[in-house]
Amino acid sequence: PRRRTRRASRPVRRRRPRRVSRRRRARRRR
C-alpha cells in the first residue's frame, strides 16, 4: 500500500504570483 504524505492529504493549489510592486512586497513581508 502507498504511504499517505502530508502533501497528498492536503492538496495545495499552485497560485501564479501576480505582478506586485517591490514597495508593496516589502510592506507585505512581516
UniProtKB/Swiss-Prot annotation:
Keyword DNA-binding listed: yes
Main location: nucleus
Alphabetical UniProt keywords: Chromosome, Developmental protein, Differentiation, DNA condensation, DNA-binding, Nucleosome core, Nucleus, Spermatogenesis
Tissue distribution of the protein: Testis.
One MF term in the entry's GO annotations: DNA binding
UniProt GO cellular component terms: nucleosome; nucleus
Compartment(s) of residence: Nucleus; Chromosome
Keyword hit for DNA-binding: yes
Residue numbers spanned by region Disordered: 1-30
Superkingdom, natural source: Eukaryota
Residue stretches spanning the membrane: none
Function: Protamines substitute for histones in the chromatin of sperm during the haploid phase of spermatogenesis. They compact sperm DNA into a highly condensed, stable and inactive complex.
Name of the protein described by the UniProt record: Protamine-YII
Organism field: Clupea harengus
Taxonomic lineage of the native organism: Eukaryota, Metazoa, Chordata, Craniata, Vertebrata
